Amino acid sequence: SKKPTVSKNSCGYNLFGLADGLSRGVFDLPKLFVGSEGTLGVVSEATLRLVPKPQGTLTALIHFRRLEEVGEAVPHLLSLRPSALEVMDANTLNLIGRSAHGIPADAAATLLAELDSSEGEGDLRERADQMAAICGRYQLCGDLTIAYDKEQRDQLWKARKALYPTLYRFDPRKKPINFVDDVVVPATRISELIRYLETFFEGQHVPVAIFGHIGNGNAHITPLLDVNDRQDFDKMVRAYHEIHGAVLSRFDGSICGEHGDGRVRAEYVRKMFGEELYQLFVQVKQTLDPANVMNPGIKISETPFTEHIDYQRLSKSCATCAKCNSVCPVYDVFQSEDMSSRGWFEIVTAKDYSYLDSKRVVEACLNCKSCRTICPAGVDVSELILQRRAENPNQGSRWLFALQAKLPIFEAILTLSAKTQSWWDRPVPRAILERLAAPVMKRIATT
């Protein structure tokens, strides 16, 4: 009776899958280990079954005027066997910027659908017509946007993929916080869940982005909070208990569909499955890991989630999406996290940062600003590195890097130098310049 009825669940241990295998005479150990989050053991070797790549793929962007109609359309769209069915609610569209992504002002929700085919484009176009017929029954903000080639499909996915890191731009103090981020309800009730969540957070005066895999009834809920502020902290705790409680009692859902329990949701595993089944989980854990050395405190724990909060980390501006790494010329050469924009951000903002310990990586940045250009959160890693370089223990280097960090002044000096370059290149001025600069450059070069 405690078996989750939703389409996917990663809460607790999958004893139901294990039992199903035993009923067929198969001890399906992967069913138990997959989703156990490293708490039961380590898989040292695995055989994977590969599936062929689809011959064709289409992506469709659909804007609905009414949120409730999205939920009504889902069962019909699922008959087309979509490989992806993503939803973004009105709040989310507002937060990421409608105009930046061409989203109509009157869209209550946007649906992103993707279909794969092993039979080629003809099959895809036929199913695209079926999709248009299904969506034509509802109030849409214009026609469906359908793309077949990769470049156009990537453009349609752009808003969805940039969604989470873009939320970091919203407020310098309030950041997207994940603590009720993975609930699952029956797919037919996803619109009802979204409406409930919008009403709840509106009452709390908390901005929130709600998006997720609507075909599975899986919602990713991301409130924007400053957990170092007492009022926001209290709102987070209240939302944690009220939303998880409502998902279990009102929606007959699961507290996590794919992200796992971890430490954040561990205290709710007992509430979801009941005492008898929870004690069975405990027995499984104790049997396979009697010394409790495999990820202790994960899944099986009574510790409140607030005990595990890294307050400093949650106040940082980086979303760790690694888009910056894709354009970083240093990372392109070294292919190492400590030689990348994302890695540098973690290094220079660490509590135990030391210039001498980090000198090699801090001075590797070319300050090309590519990271700032592509970052959805607007983080300028190169600027942070310039500030750290100005802390160089060598006085000469510190002065030079401090000057470089003051971009308007530094750029003015470079402009003046460029204009007088032809004069300094003459033999006599050049010799004087080299004689004056040599002691300074030697002192800097020793660092």
Question: What are these model-predicted stretches?
Answer:
Residues 63, 338, 374:
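Active-site-adjacent beta-strand anchor residues
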Residues 71, 107-110, 342-346, 359, ...:
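Non-catalytic, well-ordered alpha-helical scaffold segments
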Residues 302-320, 348-367:
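Ferredoxin-like iron-sulfur electron-transfer modules
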Residues 321-327, 331-334, 368-374, 378:
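Cys/His-rich metal-chelating microdomains
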Residues 332-345, 349:
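Flexible, glycine-rich loop/tail regions that form catalytic "lids" or insertion modules at the edges
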Residues 121, 255, 334, 357-362:
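A short, ordered amphipathic alpha-helix with a cationic face
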Residues 1-257, 261-303, 307-322, 327-331:
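Noncatalytic alpha-helical scaffold of FAD-dependent oxidoreductases
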Residues 171-174, 350-447:
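Iron-sulfur-cluster electron-transfer modules
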